[in-house]
Amino acid sequence: MRQAIFSNPNDAAEYLANYIIAKINSTPRTFVLGLPTGSSPEGIYAKLIEANKQGRVSFKNVVTFNMDEYLGLAPSDLQSYHYFMYDKFFNHIDIPRENIHILNGLAANIDEECANYEKKIKQYGRIDLFLGGLGPEGHLAFNEAGSSRNSKTRKVELVESTIKANCRFFGNDESKVPKYALSVGISTILDNSDEIAIIVLGKNKQFALDKTVNGKPNDPKYPSSYLQDHANVLIVCDNAAAGLKSKL
């Protein structure tokens, strides 16, 4: 793993945004980009929007695949990841709408939806760069503790810690947080991506970062430890996330 530590979240976001811009601009073909939601990547998206408006990068030849979506939420729901991505990113850049791929939380046939998502990724050959974040207890996308290294896109049940962490987006009411989601699997990320970049911000991510970098490799208790099994991973964090334990 390669690591880069910054004193504050803004500098970390700027570094990773510029990193993504350089990758897109140096790729003469379609660039396939994996994307997360949540608070950690918001700063990156803001920087990418600014760069797009300034003409420093275009997304006309970029194809995106998002990591996950809540099961049962319509794309128009304010808490859906469809809504988040369009509100925070897609509505403000020049990406063709047909290039955007997000799992459908209202799919009539969940198994078919997940299988088709895997097929769509394969159709593009490889994901050039998969951007991700870490859950407080080391989950990657919605791959919770116990997830297999060979897991693919599927329906997952959210654990209590994830529900607690996400309830702030639902008026701090845990009962309103969906209990299930659709998520790419560990294999989907690791085996289809040429490079993985992880943004880790804040003191509450110290534990997850430590398990990711210094923990037992391929430990199902901490799915982010599977990242040690990939040859090209960049971790970008702030001082608060790095803490004293992380040997970065």
UniProtKB/Swiss-Prot annotation:
Catalytic activity reads: alpha-D-glucosamine 6-phosphate + H2O = beta-D-fructose 6-phosphate + NH4(+)
The residues annotated as the active site are: 68, 137, 139, 144
Q: Name one GO molecular function term.
A: glucosamine-6-phosphate deaminase activity
Q: Name one GO cellular component term.
A: cytoplasm
The UniProt keywords, alphabetically, are: Carbohydrate metabolism, Hydrolase
Q: Which domain of life is it from?
A: Eukaryota
Return the EC number. 3.5.99.6
Q: Does the keyword Hydrolase apply?
A: yes
Hydrolase found in the keyword field: yes
What PROSITE patterns has UniProt attached to this entry?
GLC_GALNAC_ISOMERASE
UniProt induction comment: By N-acetylglucosamine.
Listed under GO biological process in this entry are: carbohydrate metabolic process; filamentous growth; filamentous growth of a population of unicellular organisms in response to biotic stimulus; glucosamine catabolic process; N-acetylglucosamine catabolic process; N-acetylneuraminate catabolic process
- What do we know about how this protein assembles, alone or with others? Monomer.
Q: Which family does it belong to?
A: Belongs to the glucosamine/galactosamine-6-phosphate isomerase family.
Q: What is this protein called?
A: Glucosamine-6-phosphate isomerase
What species was this sequence derived from? Candida albicans (strain SC5314 / ATCC MYA-2876)
